[in-house]
Amino acid sequence: PNNGSQRPHTIILVIGESAARPYMKAFNESMSDDTTPWLTQAKSDANMLLFNNAFACAHATVPSLEHALTEANYYNNKEFNETLSILDIAKKAGYKTYWFSNQSKIGPYDTPITIVAETADIALWSKETQYDDVLLPYLKQINKDDNNFIVFHLYGSHIYYHHRYPQTYQKWTDPGEQGKVADYKNSLLFTDNVLKEIYNYGREKLNMDAMIYLSDHGSTPGIVRNPDTVMRIVFHIPLFVYLSPSYQNEHQLVAQTLKNNTQQYFTNDLLYNLVCGVLDVESNHYDESESLASPKYRFDLTNLKTNMGTESLKDNLKYK
């Protein structure tokens, strides 16, 4: 690739589903329940960067990912069908691209996501929705001597939460409405394990240089998701970026900038530009002013928007 690295390496992006940062121990040290034991421990590694002020641009999967995966966002008014995607930019940078999804390919609801996914060199969907670890064996077909860009699209904590994890992950139980919250925590616990497996395999077998995880949007367990009464928690999402020591050595400015920006505010429709930054590409399809990985990043609480561009993030946060 033209990004300064001559050695074969892999970059992994994991897209979560309905994971809400306020329910994740790694982002909330005062939480008594450790819903993220792997990440809680992994964040003590200086190469693992957690971003505490990441938010979803929308409260539903399609409008969120239609923007996260492409140049189009709620700030530049570009149209989805006129933009490059993260897979396009990775291909231009010399990567073999993979898309592994545990979200159904059929139905009108995922069309823009499927359009992007199908441009991968290899795109695989699980046969039917199963537990997310069904995707892990797909990693075995990847050649560590290639430059690989891999996207995982998890089913994560999609309702109904108790269908998202095997019984062995049922750590919390509660009656009634609180039962949904317990099930939700269990689903996050299982996702944490899936992330651990991807991370370990990438590091041990694929020369992993970077791993990014974020969610499409959050969730409000026990609360009906309605656009008019949507609880603010639905916009609070996790974001982490792992950078290997060799990556940091070769891309010192990007690495230092991301370390400096862990407290910066970010909405996930800016994911495309973050990925461009991590790939360290030079392209007229990369707006550095919209990249959390660039010193030119121009966003903060005063000019970010959520709820499909209709609400200032600053106003939204008043209703925590």
Question: Which residue stretches match the model-derived regions?
Answer:
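Active-site-proximal alpha/beta segments of enzymes that process anionic O-linked groups
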Residues: P1-L13, S18-W172, T267-N268, N273-R298
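A long, amphipathic alpha-helix that forms part
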Residues: P1-N2, L136-K140, W172-L214, V241-L243, ...
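DG-centered beta-turn motif at the end of beta-strands
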Residues: I15-A19, I212-G218
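Small-molecule pocket liners
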Residues: L65-E66, H236-L239
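Short glycine/proline-rich turn/loop motifs
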Residues: H67, W172-K180, H251-T257
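Membrane-interface soluble catalytic domains
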Residues: D88, K105-I106, N200-K205, P221, ...
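Alpha-helical scaffolding within the catalytic cores
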Residues: P137-Y138, V224-D228
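Acidic helix/loop microenvironments that form the catalytic cleft of cell-wall polysaccharide enzymes
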Residues: G156, S215-I223
